[in-house]
């Protein structure tokens, strides 16, 4: 029996590919809610139809939602209605909309109730074969040179598994970037987790990149990338920050020379690394 108290707000994970991963508690909670707050109506209606939940009132909350939308949800809770949040797939707030809403509700004394459930982040991690004692989630692999430099500063943390997402149309370019900058790292690409065509590719970046080049069908689907580098791998974190500071002031070659002088990084490797930042703005 679930006790629905006044001013409770539920965070409800949904399957990332296999409907059987929806928990019994999640289904019961969805059934009992007065209003289900969703990222997109179309995808959530498909889920509701599959789990045989009919006539459920739905509200949209996504990246375009405003402070007025958050206030509207709080007003509904104050009126005694019970609400819960789902994303299109997986656990809400993990690379999905919702942080501002949850923070706002907490600040207004709403009891936020998290339900455990599916997420591609830990699903990929536990089957990766990479260390699980320390890990970080970095969202999506960045597109711009400036954002890549900051992202690589995070990847340069030693002895920690980094987890991030990539889309089908950018996966090969991202693997090329990783191979160029971290050829000795350990890499796992998890494709279509929990779905029929689930697949794990494990090894050095060059090996995995070659597999994608040989089989174009690999590039379709959704990807979780898991990355690990140990103490023996050259640290470019300070060089990346230097590039971020000087990229609009000095030629790339000059920044690479300065990096070698300041941080003892190999000048040629640093130069190639900076080129990869610049050519994929």
Go through each PLM region and give its residues:
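Class I SAM-dependent methyltransferase SAM-binding "motif I" and its flanking Rossmann-like core
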Residues: 100-158
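A contiguous loop/helix-start segment that scaffolds small-molecule binding in enzyme catalytic cores
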Residues: 82, 161, 165-281
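Conserved helicase motor
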Residues: 61-66, 141-142
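Short active-site oxyanion
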Residues: 30-36, 109-113, 161-162
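Short, hinge-like loop/turn segments at secondary-structure boundaries
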Residues: 53-56, 75-77, 101-104, 128-133, ...
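Glycine-rich, highly charged phosphate/nucleotide-binding loops
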Residues: 65-73
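A glycine-rich beta-strand to alpha-helix segment
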Residues: 78-123, 169-173
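Glycine-rich, flexible N-terminal cofactor/catalytic loop recognition
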Residues: 4-62
